[in-house]
Amino acid sequence: MRVPLRLLLTLIIAAAIAGCGFQLRGTKSGNLPYKTMYIALPETADVRIWMERYINAAGSSEIVDDAKLADATFQQLLDSRQKTILSVNAQGRVREYRLQLNYTFRLVNQKGQVLVAPNEISLTRDITFDDSNVLAKDLEEGLLWRDMNNDLVNQIIRRL
């Protein structure tokens, strides 16, 4: 008698979750309302590479190489990355750094009309530093910048 009760309870919970529109973060289709899109960034820019991956994976929009052929053009207005000292130890050596990424973008159509007003995204990560582990901390910093780029592109795609 316990097995059918558990099964029934599981089915009720699953129906309630599905009924409220819950989706796992990675399973959303991410459909953009634009059929074609131009990304006004150099081909080697990290943000462009990550955006192309997300948009191509969603399959709802096509990335074009000419702004005249695009329904929407992504324009970067600001890309500021800073590494500042957060704290020092008693000997005056750095203990922590703060990594800051400030990014502003907008989306315009072929006529130059603004489709998405300028949006500012600010991301911050703190990293500890140790003189005896310089190489490891350098790798950790690189991973944090990469993680911040990933978060940045996720937020950009959601705002488009």
Label each region the model flagged.
Residues 135-160:
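C-terminal/domain-edge helix-coil "capping" segments
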Residues 8-18:
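Bacterial N-terminal signal peptides
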Residues 75-120, 124-142:
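Surface-exposed short loop/turn segments
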Residues 55, 59, 107-111, 131, ...:
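Sec/Tat-exported extracytoplasmic proteins
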Residues 61-72:
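Short acidic low-complexity segments
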Residues 2-3, 18-60:
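A structural "domain/chain start" motif
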Residues 1-9:
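Bacterial N-terminal signal peptides that target proteins for export
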